Regions:
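N-terminal intrinsically disordered, low-complexity segments enriched in P/E/S/T
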Residues: 1-108
Length: 108
C-alpha cells in the first residue's frame, strides 16, 4: 500500500505538522470493503469512538498516520496511529473527529 505524506494544521498543537501514513480509503480498497458497507468505526485505546460514513471515507484524503514530522508517534504523543485530515477537508474542521491512539477499526 502506498505511503502518503500530508502537511496540515494540527488543531491541538496549533501548528503545521507533516504526517505520514496510508489513506483510509486505500485501506478500505485493499480490504475489499463492499459497496453495501455504510460505517467505519474507529476506537481509541481509551474507548473513545468515532464513526465515519464509508462514502465520506472513500471520497476524502483522510490519513491513518503513523509518523509525525518524520518520527513514529508514541502513545503519549497521540500514537501509534491517528486520523488526520488535509486542510481542505470539511471533516477536519471538527476536532472531535481527530481520533488518536487508534486501537481498532470495524466496518459495517
Amino acid at each position: 500500500m502506498r505511503r502518503v505524506r500530508l502537511e496540515t494544521a494540527e488543531p491541538f498543537l496549533k501548528r503545521r505538522v507533516t504526517f505520514e501514513g496510508v489513506l483510509l480509503s486505500d485501506l478500505l480498497a485493499v480490504a475489499d470493503v463492499p459497496d453495501t458497507a455504510s460505517t467505519v468505526s474507529l476506537t481509541a485505546l481509551d474507548d473513545y469512538k468515532v464513526d465515519f460514513k464509508v462514502a465520506d471515507v472513500r471520497s476524502s484524503q483522510m490519513l491513518l498516520a503513523t509518523k509525525a514530522d518524520g518520527k513514529h508517534m508514541p502513545v503519549d504523543r497521540s500514537g501509534p496511529i491517528r486520523i488526520v485530515f488535509p486542510d481542505s477537508s470539511s471533516m477536519g474542521r471538527n476536532p472531535d473527529l481527530w481520533i488518536w491512539s487508534v486501537a481498532s477499526m470495524q466496518v459495517a
